[in-house]
Amino acid sequence: MIKITVPATSANLGIGYDTLAMAVSLYSHFTFERADKLTITGCPEEFQNENNLVYVSFVDALAAWGEPAFPVAIDIQTDVPVARGLGSSSTCVVAGIMAAAALTGHTVDRAELVRIATEVEGHPDNVAPAILGGAVCSFTPTDSLPQCLRYEVSDRLRFITVIPPYEVHTSEARKVVPQEIPLSTAVWQMGRIAGMTRGLETGDLDLIAAANDDRIQEPYRRRLIPDYNAVRDTCLNGGAKTIWISGSGSTLMAVTDDTIVAKFLQVKLREQFPKCDTHILTCDTEGAQIEYL
């Protein structure tokens, strides 16, 4: 039996639409073992079948290596909610691929994991930091493999994470984003992406806040999150330096380097928004891990 632990991820980091993402200290845990028939536990019954994304990713990885599919027993225990902008699908994809490698004896480095996960998921945004840990800037050159640039994130930073009780599906969130932008907007974004990566590395809150001024997606996606304005005001008035939408939402993530401020905000947010889950997270630096039981 093997156990695979995969971190949640926060994509975009405000300014880096479809480019930047970060692994965070919220996790999904998966166990796998060979079995006589496919069984999946720990998730709603509607997902306990061969269409489960974990098993689909498992089978796709086997096919990529020329291996036949075989039945397994999978148990899923997760703290990463679905359709909240925390990379829940990426945790499933990464776990399935890693399990396929482990149960067939394939030695696969992390670059290969990213490549296969990108093929399954369709883009490297979330799977790359889920595998590599840290913050990642990713892009896929024409007719080439995905390029993933990993950055360290200062361990001083705390991310106050507010998870509303409602979903925002990526497909819906993409519909509200303009398909074309002016050149001036592209220039605005590019400099700030560089500023964000540097600010995260150094823990420079002023730089992070200055860089976090997106003009591509947040002005439109915030309308899909009823609690956006109220949560934002509470966080900024309570001492957080800045706040962004995690992925396509509905999760919101505020940033500070002061643990007292983080704890104060967690209490205040839980009081004001009792239906939301509120966590104080850090950047996960290790990425997905496997344990042989």
Task: Give the positions of each predicted feature.
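Alpha/beta catalytic cores of group-transfer enzymes, especially the acyltransferase/condensing modules
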Residues: 108-157, 243-245, 249
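DPxDG-like acidic metal-binding loop motif
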Residues: 26, 86-110, 131-136
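Short beta-strand-to-turn element immediately C-terminal to the catalytic PLP-Schiff-base lysine
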Residues: 33, 130-132, 136-141, 253-257, ...
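Phosphate-handling active-site elements
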Residues: 35, 63-73, 100-116, 143-147, ...
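Glycine-rich, charge-dense phosphate/pyrophosphate-binding loop(s)
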Residues: 200-293
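Anionic-ligand binding region
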Residues: 136, 140-149, 167-199, 208
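Solvent-exposed alpha-helices and their adjacent loops that cap or buttress functional pockets
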Residues: 12-13, 21-24, 66-67, 120-121, ...
